[in-house]
Amino acid sequence: MRPIMMDMKHAYLPFLVPLSVLALSPISAAKINVELKDANGKSVGSALMYESDGIVIQLNLHDLPLGEHAIHIHQNAVCDPPDFKSAGPHFNPDNKKHGLENPAGHHAGDMQNFVVGANGKAKAQIVNKDVNWGSDNHSIFSNGGTALVIHAKADDMKTDPAGNAGDRIACGVIKK
């Protein structure tokens, strides 16, 4: 019996089709690492961000005060210490009210709180389905970038304009 001989000019086809499917896949493999700094310019950790049905934010933080803290995406890609007011208001392309529990809708930059342990560390994953990496007005890059801001207290999820979350204690610029 003779072995089956493949025409070598077509030997690449079994590999080409799966690669073309991957190239057309809408899932982005790009990731951005945002370093967060406190009012003294000291790093307090990072946020690994990637797109997956919104933006996934994986927090790995240290040297923060114990307790529940708010984290928001703010309008400007600027983090001037000590108060980080340069980051501007919450990212809000639809001009909605503040708070995930607000019946009138919420800012695109509003997100769930996270908890810092007694050791000053926090690891958390937050998903924000109201923002993206695209080119529309919900893109976190639409204004030349945005900022990730950690607040001293928890967000109450309803009080306009910022949820009574207290001072801005850490900030990181989000840019491509």
Predicted segments — roles?
Residues 5-15:
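Bacterial N-terminal signal peptides that target proteins for export
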Residues 14-23:
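Bacterial N-terminal signal peptides
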Residues 24-176:
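N-terminal leader/targeting pre-sequences
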